[in-house]
Amino acid sequence: MKQYKSVLLFALVVVLITACGPKATETPVFQGNNPYAPQTGDSNLMIGDLTIDSSSVFLAKSQPPQVMVNFAYFQPTPCYQLRVEVSGPDTDKHINLKAYAVAEKDKPCALMALATPLQASLNLGSFPSGHYFVMLNGNQIGEFDS
């Protein structure tokens, strides 16, 4: 009987200690669809800058609402491929997108830059309740309430 009381007392102490601990916070993780995610061999490629022509952020009418980002961009030449790194939200509720282009280092490209911008669309997924800011290459392109 004494052993039973000891086990019960120990279990009660453990429950009380865990109940008094910090509340678990919901940490959003990117769970959207990024067809432009960095690839494993990108470290061997040459990186080029993009010029963003236009951008938009909107919520898709779904349950839960999905955050969508569209942007038009110019890349150095058609030989480059788009990459977009998605991070956040950070403590200030900024969702950061870093867009750039990659191309093979030792392969010359004789093609001229395109005169019309290319289009890209990303589904960032859904987020916990709050007010968020979407940043693309350091510039705010939109905000939304979730």
Predicted segments with their positions:
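Bacterial N-terminal signal peptides that target proteins for export
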Residues: M1-L8
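C-terminal motif of bacterial Sec signal peptides marking the signal peptidase cleavage site
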Residues: L16-A19
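Bacterial signal peptide processing site
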Residues: G21-K23
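Beta-strand/beta-sandwich contexts
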Residues: E26-P65, Q81-R83
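Mature extracytoplasmic domains of secretory-pathway proteins
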Residues: K61-D106
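An anionic, turn-rich surface loop/hairpin at beta-sheet edges
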Residues: K98-S126
